Amino acid sequence: MYLEQLKEVNPLTICITNNVVKNFTANGLLALGASPAMSECIEDLEDLLKVANALLINIGTLTKESWQLYQEAIKIANKNQVPVVLDPVAAGASRFRLEVSLDLLKNYSISLLRGNGSEIAALVGEKQASKGADGGKVADLESIAVKANQVFDVPVVVTGETDAIAVRGEVRLLQNGSPLMPLVTGTGCLLGAVLAAFIGSSDRSDDLACLTEAMTVYNVSGEIAEKVAKGKGVGSFQVAFLDALSQMKSEMIMDK
């Protein structure tokens, strides 16, 4: 349902993301059926966000200048009622990253918070090991998701060996995916963009259902890619993953 709607809408998804993953993110969105724009010029965004379906803010390659860009872009998105997805990359790795992430969450309207266990744990004051975008082990992703949902009053997606989605106090746990996905730089960052495209093309009447389908589409694409690339390595997996995203249909996830 939501995947077909995305393909029909072809949502313009503005991605202010990190320098490492821009190409992969754009190609992933195109494969899925969305329309990416990677603009980082405020004068440009003033017009783009009047017609955009969603905005992704990914703080991976953070600078003081980019912090100001995030703030200005979110202000424009909020003014135009464009949903904003925040990916607080490595929020627990430094005080500066934590400060920026909390500023964006507390002072602007965020539509979805997406991160790994360590990142989201840091935002809610839980003591967890963090080693950048890869994060550390978090024992209970479900409780972290619920706490973040309550603290920030925003839908939350927490990724790990089990993914947790929390919306208005309701939680859903998902276990699809491939162990090869974390071995390709940008798979987590692309996920943030994919979630933005999904909610940006929906009517927002049931975020839990929409996010569940988005996560399942993404993770099942990883499973398909793993089978295709078996024995070939992570380079082949990356290509197979984009192929799987481009060929994904709703009936392929019906029993997942």
From Swiss-Prot:
Cofactor(s) needed: Mg(2+)
EC id: 2.7.1.50
Gene Ontology terms: biological process: thiamine biosynthetic process; thiamine diphosphate biosynthetic process
Gene Ontology terms for molecular function: ATP binding; hydroxyethylthiazole kinase activity; magnesium ion binding
Keyword Magnesium found: yes
Enzyme class: transferase
Record bears the keyword NAD: no
Reaction equations catalysed: 5-(2-hydroxyethyl)-4-methylthiazole + ATP = 4-methyl-5-(2-phosphooxyethyl)-thiazole + ADP + H(+)
One Pfam family named in its UniProt record: HK
Residues given in the record as ATP binding sites: 114, 159
Function: Catalyzes the phosphorylation of the hydroxyl group of 4-methyl-5-beta-hydroxyethylthiazole (THZ).
Protein name: Hydroxyethylthiazole kinase
